[in-house]
């Protein structure tokens, strides 16, 4: 049988022959992860099911990234509980403090996930690792507890939608614009329990960071996973992260897709997702006179070094509007240090940005950038549901780094090509 990317990877991790979408299979997992919000729930379930040890102390990752640095007593208690569990179980990959980053940027950087892996996490944006050619998906904390104990879980093999992007990317149009365009076309439930498989010349041209940006938001269309073929760029990235033994692979010729979509990127312009759903997508040029009080550049979607370079290029020699607070959150300590070496941190500070630690913070309305009634933000994050970043009476627009940075300068949502 000719396999899609999702089927091909799952087949490597099960002893059952995968013959069709919809089939139920048990798969061995390569990595299991949870964070400071979801790990305590998983630990409770782990105890309740009578588990005594994690299946492999080197293949469980616990990353304290959402409410950290601990924003209040409850957050501190959550982290303490998880820390004690990690020590009890001898978990190798426990991250808190100076070595901690946003989980979906940190794990690829450390070489803990890669091509052909099956990764499950108690976080919906676990699908990020599809940018590396992994079948990666979010599960509930109870299922993650089971995976931590057993080293396996069950899946219904998802049908696959193939999205082909052709042409050459124009200036200021990047991976975020591509994925928002796709979500705008099919809706927030357009890929419900489907794998999204990305290909085409424009996809091949993206760097691995851009691919992770797109895979990250597969869930915003309801996707079970977002997948890219593993190619030479993937292998170079993974080798630099310390991985060995990875190999390139792609979907089989003749694989069956439930649906095929095609987008020509050549004439694209920057886009934004308007409140209050990621599929409410419009060209920036059509969003007129929309003022913003906050800009957030960071997150598991767009907090990597390439994103910071893109934002800094727009901000260099310019000042953030006095009516705007622009918050820049490099996604890992490694990215922070690289940005420091390249002078990007200086650029952000000179422009008047607030540069903070690696945290999910404002993305989920947790801390370090909460919106008041009537306030509006543009952010490089992944969700703009009502009340997502604070007050139910606030609004969030989603964009790529260049558009966010340009909007910080003008105080209104701005196409960076017009500066």
Swiss-Prot record:
Known EC number(s)? 4.2.1.33
> Part of which pathway?
Amino-acid biosynthesis; L-leucine biosynthesis; L-leucine from 3-methyl-2-oxobutanoate: step 2/4
**Keywords recorded for this protein, A-Z:** 4Fe-4S, Amino-acid biosynthesis, Branched-chain amino acid biosynthesis, Iron, Iron-sulfur, Leucine biosynthesis, Lyase, Metal-binding
Family annotation (Pfam families): Aconitase
The catalysed reaction is:
(2R,3S)-3-isopropylmalate = (2S)-2-isopropylmalate
Can you provide one Gene Ontology molecular function annotated for this UniProt record? 3-isopropylmalate dehydratase activity
GO biological process annotation, one example: L-leucine biosynthetic process
Which InterPro entries does the entry mention?
Acnase/IPM_dHydase_lsu_aba_1/3, Acoase/IPM_deHydtase_lsu_aba, Aconitase_4Fe-4S_BS, Aconitase_4Fe-4S_dom, HAcnase/IPMdehydase_lsu_prok, Homoacnase/IPMdehydase_lsu, IPM_dehydratase_rel_enz, IPMI_cat
Q: Which cofactor does it need?
A: [4Fe-4S] cluster
Q: Which cysteines are joined by disulfide bonds?
A: none
Question: Which residues participate in [4Fe-4S] cluster binding?
Answer: 300, 360, 363
Cofactor annotation comment: Binds 1 [4Fe-4S] cluster per subunit.
Q: What does this protein do?
A: Catalyzes the isomerization between 2-isopropylmalate and 3-isopropylmalate, via the formation of 2-isopropylmaleate.
Family indicated by similarity: Belongs to the aconitase/IPM isomerase family. LeuC type 2 subfamily.
PANTHER family noted in UniProt: 3-ISOPROPYLMALATE DEHYDRATASE LARGE SUBUNIT 2 (PTHR43822:SF16), HOMOACONITASE, MITOCHONDRIAL-RELATED (PTHR43822)
Its subunit composition reads: Heterodimer of LeuC and LeuD.
- Name the UniProt record assigns to this protein: 3-isopropylmalate dehydratase large subunit
> Species name for this entry?
Nitratidesulfovibrio vulgaris (strain DP4)
């Amino acid at each position: 049988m000719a396999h899609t990317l999702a089927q091909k990877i799952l087949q490597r991790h099960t002893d059952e022959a995968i013959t069709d979408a919809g089939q139920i299979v048990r798969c061995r997992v390569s990595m299991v992860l949870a964070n400071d919000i979801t790990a305590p729930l998983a630990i409770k379930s782990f105890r309740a099911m009578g588990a005594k040890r994690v299946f492999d102390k080197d293949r469980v990752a616990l990353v304290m990234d959402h409410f950290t640095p601990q924003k209040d007593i409850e957050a501190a208690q959550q982290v303490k509980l998880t820390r004690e569990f990690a020590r009890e179980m001898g978990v190798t990959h426990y991250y808190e403090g100076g070595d901690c980053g946003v989980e979906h940027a940190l794990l690829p950087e450390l070489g803990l996930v890669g091509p052909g892996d099956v990764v499950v996490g108690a976080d919906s944006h676990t699908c990020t690792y599809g940018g590396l050619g992994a079948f990666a998906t979010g599960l509930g904390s109870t299922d993650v507890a089971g995976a931590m104990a057993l080293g396996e879980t069950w899946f219904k093999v998802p049908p696959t939608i193939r999205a082909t992007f052709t042409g050459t990317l124009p200036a200021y149009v990047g991976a975020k614009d591509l994925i928002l365009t796709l979500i705008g076309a099919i809706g927030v439930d357009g890929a419900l329990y489907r794998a999204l498989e990305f290909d085409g010349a424009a996809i091949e041209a993206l760097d691995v960071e851009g691919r992770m940006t797109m895979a990250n938001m597969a869930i915003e269309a309801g996707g079970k996973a977002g997948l890219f073929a593993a190619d030479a760029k993937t292998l170079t990235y993974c080798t630099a992260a310390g991985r060995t033994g990875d190999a390139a692979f792609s979907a089989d010729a003749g694989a069956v897709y439930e649906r095929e979509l095609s987008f020509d990127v050549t004439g694209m312009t920057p886009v934004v997702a308007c409140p209050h759903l990621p599929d409410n997508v419009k060209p920036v040029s059509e969003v007129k006179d929309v003022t913003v009080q906050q800009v957030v550049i960071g997150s598991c979607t767009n907090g990597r070094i390439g994103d910071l370079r893109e934002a800094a290029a727009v901000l260099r020699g310019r000042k953030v509007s006095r009516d705007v607070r622009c918050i820049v959150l490099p996604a890992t300590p490694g990215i922070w240090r690289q940005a420091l070496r390249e002078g990007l941190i200086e650029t952000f500070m000179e422009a008047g940005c607030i540069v903070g630690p690696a945290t999910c913070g404002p993305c989920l309305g947790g801390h370090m950038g909460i919106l008041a009634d009537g306030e509006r933000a543009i952010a490089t994050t992944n969700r703009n549901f009502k009340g997502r970043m604070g007050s139910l009476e606030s609004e969030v627009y989603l964009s790529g780094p260049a558009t966010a940075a340009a909007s910080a300068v003008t105080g209104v949502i701005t196409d960076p090509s017009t500066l």
